[in-house]
Amino acid sequence: LVDSSTNIFWTRALLGVGEAPLFLAGTRVLVHWFSAEERGSAIGLFNGSASLGPALAPPFLLAIMAWWGWRDMSVLVGVINLLLAVIWIVYYRDPVSGEVSAPTPAHSARASLRSALKDDLGYLLRQRNTWAATAGYTGVVYLSSLYVTWLPAWLEKTENLSVIQAGLLSAFPQIFSFLGCFMGGRLMDMISQRGVAPLVACRRTVVLSMLACAILTGTLALQPGSIPAIVLLTFTLFASGVAVSCGWTLGTLIVTENRVATLEAIQNTGASLGGVLAPLLTGILATRYGSFGPAFILACGIGLVSVVMYHKGFSGRTLKS
């Protein structure tokens, strides 16, 4: 329905507003259903869906766009999402169902909101672990957003591919990002089931995966040939997926259940910052130097800072008091 770039911008902004609570609400649901020792796989699969979409979408959406145009493609995507929303509303239930409670009076709701801001948000913002988790996850999302937003353009420029060819080829490594998300959660659960504390298992996994992702990203700055580049991208996005899964799960392990959504909201603010800076800085550097090499080097450095934050930034205790 839009007819200008300005309207597209505002429509995309509204889409972002609608998407913002999804990860927070979904994480809260998984915390309800799964214990700390088994929630890694569930959250990994949940986070992995965000990578599976970009992997599956290009071949289908490009075909639809080629046949019917981008407007019909957008309508189809919207209809599918509305159907999924209806299915969720109809079938989802909390693990423990009871009688419907009476509506909360307005003054009680306002008091609860003030209490939550003071007791939860204020408390969490004063804690070192909150800032370490947020800073670390900013780097995680910076690297993942770099590949989501610029991978097709990078392949198009360096390998002299058409837009459609680059879009299709970029979908292949994204599948490994999904596998990394799921395997990262599964790996955490396996380590926890061997007697290692879930928080320790999560931190170890995110540190190692981010270290691998940062080093592999720096290697891409050397501009290897097409086949080595695709192989490197496959391993890089797998490691990135592991880090995304573990970094998000970490927030559910350092706070009590009633504070999970608040902490994840704080962490998600850092993630949004990383998601904005990655395409912006990459575009600036690629334009300035005529190459993606400097952008990959910067991303490598940001990834290494994230590793330090996860390894050294935590105080060693949870925020469950």
Functional labels for PLM-detected ranges:
Residues 199-247:
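C-terminal transmembrane helical hairpin of 12-TM major facilitator-type secondary transporters
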Residues 99-134:
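Juxtamembrane intracellular "pre-TM" segments in multi-pass secondary transporters
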Residues 46-96:
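Helix-loop-helix hairpin linking two adjacent transmembrane segments in secondary transporters
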